[in-house]
Amino acid sequence: MAQYRIDSQEYLANGTTIFEANMLADKNGNIINTFGNASNIPLANGDLEGYTAVHKFGALDGTVGTGWSTIWTGGETTGQQLYPWPAIVDASVVTVVSDDDADTTDVTLEGLDTNYAFQTETICLTGETPVTGTKTWHRINRAFMSGTATNVGTIVVKNATPTVITEIKAERGQSLQAFYTVPAGSTGFLNTVQMTASKNQAVEIAMFARPFGGAFRVVGGVYLFQSDHTIEYATPIKFTEKTDIDVRAIGAANGVLSAAFDLILVDNA
């Protein structure tokens, strides 16, 4: 194998020690990863066409009851422990409102339209007066304050049923929800999951996934007792388009929990 030195601009002589460099490339030969601290900067920066990094995270400050609960802000309210997947079978416009009149800045929603294609919508809050958007939503994967101020009160997003489908906790500026739906035309590859239980009590935290038209089932999890755990998959877990992902916990009441996971979306084309 011929080797060329950039600094001296010449090929190495025969018999010179040979070095090899390994890199990961996509099907078109584009480098998509190397090793080291800067390995995924091109991916995070959006420089790789057809590849998207997704980081999801959620927190639950006080579980209600001892049954399963999705790790999201809504789970702190009685009756909202599990994310209401049955209530979002039909797509609809959404209504956004705060419980504090001081919230009059913009909220941006990210999620999927009626065809499960990615879309965004920015809605200007009018405090405690509900505002209805114009786009139709099948899933909302994220909500965040995109104006000039962080939210003072709790921001609630409801669909047409009306059911709470996303919340932004007061003074957080971003939804805290450990669930996600893979967009149409993409495949998700799960690299890492982090789970934390802060209280001195036992809890089971598990990731559930539901392929389109299928049922939720556990794809990974852990038992914790005032500890944290990170799972790094040597071979990523594959999620097909329109798969719903939901990180849930079960254990004693008033648990304080958090979870996060990282996906790489790859265009199916």
Question: Where are these predicted regions, by residue range?
Answer:
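Beta-strand-centric surfaces of beta-sandwich/beta-rich domains
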Residues: A2-Q9, T34-R139, S146-A269
